[in-house]
Amino acid sequence: MLKSAKLYIPSIAAIILSSNIAMAXNNYDTGHATPLRQVADLIDNQITNIDNLFKNRLPLYESNSIKSNFITKDKQYIIIMEVPGFDKSQIKIKVNGNKLFITRNIEEKNKADDSDNYMNKNFNYVISLYEDVDQANISSSLKNGILTIILPRIEIKEQDAREITIN
């Protein structure tokens, strides 16, 4: 029985804390923080600290991802990607079936120190191509950190449709 009571105490405290948060806020606005409000602030600070720990450690949470734009025009599609610091020998563009693959898979050793630290600047984009893309005439260019891929469009003849009767 004592073990089950220990399990319920944190749950009960959380319920009391959440149900009385408005009451604690009233005194907090006047500059007189209640013990309940102090506990709520402590919990908020700890959650913020945990969020900051992961945000600073995982670049996934940062806005370091490659920015891209897809533009549709009458005669072509245009893909524009920001890839600052890359040169054309580091980026590979391939077409396979109806997929366009844009990749960079190179590890760079950190030259600033003698440790075995590597910087990973890899990326891998797979784009499904529309059926009206002229795959034989896709072109690309890289200038000032901007990768531009031109996907020419061809006219697709509509196949003769046949109506199916419902029995």
Curated annotation (Swiss-Prot):
Domain sHSP residue range list: 59-167
Family annotation (PROSITE patterns): SHSP
SUPFAM superfamilies per the UniProt record, alphabetical: HSP20-like chaperones
InterPro entries xref list: A-crystallin/Hsp20_dom (IPR002068), HSP20-like_chaperone (IPR008978)
Pfam families reported for this sequence: HSP20
Domain of life: Bacteria
Keywords: Stress response
Family statement: Belongs to the small heat shock protein (HSP20) family.
Protein name from the UniProt record: Small heat shock protein C1
Organism expressing this protein natively: Rickettsia felis (strain ATCC VR-1525 / URRWXCal2)
